[in-house]
Amino acid sequence: MPTLLTIFGIRFFFYSREHEPIHVHVEHADGKAKFILGEDAVELVECKGLKTSTLKLAESILEENRIDFIAQWKATFNG
């Protein structure tokens, strides 16, 4: 379960046996979420228990790191 980044108590990761579309799981003490990382955007597809403020922060961090996270996904699964 490779961790891509942990910041502000939020962990961004994917599982070692993932499937497309490219996506990242997010965990925080509040709950969890899953985002698809597209070529141009980040899309929330699942959220359980995260506060709105935590969710918005996670989405912002994903937008800033989207290209790097996509590259790490591709290196892991297409590598």
Tell me the role of every PLM-derived stretch.
Residues 1-12:
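Negatively charged, low-complexity tracts enriched in Asp/Glu with abundant Ser/Thr
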Residues 10-12, 33, 67, 75:
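Short non-domain terminal segments
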Residues 15-50:
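A short, structured beta-strand/loop element
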